[in-house]
Structure formats: structure tokens, C-alpha cells
């Protein structure tokens, strides 16, 4: 894996920080769920990202106030966003960065353990295949090396 992946417009050094992530994803607070990119292997089509889970997350106000737990659907969304960063880097490298990707399918989702404030969620996404404007990914979310959630995720690109 290279420590300095390149795109058509800029040279990126790992880790990729939140400012660069915001340049690649359309999401913003409170729905931007990726804080840092730790690893990027464009040959293996794999990315590892980080989400720092804070008690200040708005979803903890109602899920659940007395026992805050990160909703599983948001863990899946965080995985999809990590995959989105990888896809956007690949597209911008190939001159096709005008697509906006939407999650269109989730299969085989499993939630093995709760994610709570203070956890560091590691998001590991691998692109399994790409068919035209569709990307199929497998993702695992880990806390302290333990898989807390996993899923097969499909996203579709639409011209923005």
C-alpha cells in the first residue's frame, strides 16, 4: 500500500483528515460519519476509516438517553461513507468525479455488539465488484479489534 495515493488534482497523504473528506463527500454535520482515513489500498479496493463516537452526537439524545447506543443503521451509513471516499478518490483519479452515490441495498447486516460514546469505530470497506454505475462492497466495523457490525452494501452513482 502506498502512503501517498494520488488523484488527478492533488496528492493525498495518509491519514486523510476531515477537511479532505469533506471535499470528497457531500455529507455534513450531523450526518458526516467519517472522521479520518487511516488506510487506502486502491489496488485491493480497500479503505480503512475512523469514526470517533462522542456523547455529543445528536442521535444519543433519543437513542437512548439513559443508555446511549449508536444506532446500527448509522454504523452501516458510516461504512457506506467510507466506501464513498474510496469511490470518489478512484473516480476523481479517472476524471469522473461528477457522480453522487446513494446506498440502494444492504444485505446480510449483522450487529454483534453495541457501540457507545467513547468508542473509536474502525470502518473497513472492500469493493467486491463494480458494474457500470453500481458498486458492491463488504464492510466490517470494529471497536478494539472486535467486529461490532458487518454488511454487504450496494451503492448506485447518479450524475450530480
UniProtKB/Swiss-Prot annotation:
* A Pfam family recorded for this sequence: FabA
Q: What is its EC number?
A: 4.2.1.59
Q: Which GO terms describe its molecular function?
A: (3R)-hydroxyacyl-[acyl-carrier-protein] dehydratase activity
**Which top-level enzyme class is recorded in the Swiss-Prot or TrEMBL entry?**
lyase
User: Keywords in UniProt for this one?
Assistant: Cytoplasm, Lipid A biosynthesis, Lipid biosynthesis, Lipid metabolism, Lyase
Q: Does the keyword Lipid biosynthesis apply?
A: yes
Family annotation (SUPFAM superfamilies) = Thioesterase/thiol ester dehydrase-isomerase
Which GO cellular component does the record give, naming just one?
A: cytoplasm
Q: Please name the catalytic residues of this protein.
A: 63
Q: What processes does the entry annotate via GO biological process terms?
A: fatty acid biosynthetic process; lipid A biosynthetic process
CDD domains per record: FabZ
Superkingdom, natural source: Bacteria
* Membership in a protein family: Belongs to the thioester dehydratase family. FabZ subfamily.
The task this protein performs is described as: Involved in unsaturated fatty acids biosynthesis. Catalyzes the dehydration of short chain beta-hydroxyacyl-ACPs and long chain saturated and unsaturated beta-hydroxyacyl-ACPs.
This one is known as 3-hydroxyacyl-[acyl-carrier-protein] dehydratase FabZ
Amino acid at each position: 500500500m502506498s502512503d501517498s495515493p494520488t488523484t488527478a488534482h492533488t496528492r493525498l497523504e495518509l491519514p486523510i483528515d476531515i477537511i479532505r473528506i469533506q471535499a470528497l463527500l457531500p455529507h455534513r454535520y450531523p450526518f458526516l460519519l467519517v472522521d479520518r482515513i487511516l488506510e487506502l489500498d486502491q489496488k485491493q479496493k480497500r479503505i480503512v476509516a475512523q469514526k470517533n463516537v462522542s456523547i455529543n452526537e445528536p442521535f444519543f439524545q433519543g437513542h437512548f438517553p439513559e443508555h446511549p447506543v449508536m444506532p446500527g443503521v448509522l454504523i452501516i451509513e458510516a461504512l457506506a461513507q467510507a466506501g464513498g471516499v474510496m469511490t470518489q478518490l478512484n473516480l476523481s483519479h479517472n476524471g469522473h468525479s461528477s457522480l453522487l452515490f446513494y446506498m440502494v441495498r444492504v444485505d446480510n447486516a449483522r450487529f454483534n455488539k453495541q457501540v457507545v460514546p467513547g468508542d473509536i469505530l474502525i470502518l473497513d470497506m472492500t469493493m467486491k465488484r463494480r458494474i457500470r454505475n453500481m458498486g458492491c462492497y463488504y464492510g466490517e466495523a470494529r471497536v478494539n479489534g472486535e467486529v461490532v457490525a458487518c454488511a454487504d452494501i450496494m451503492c448506485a452513482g447518479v450524475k450530480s
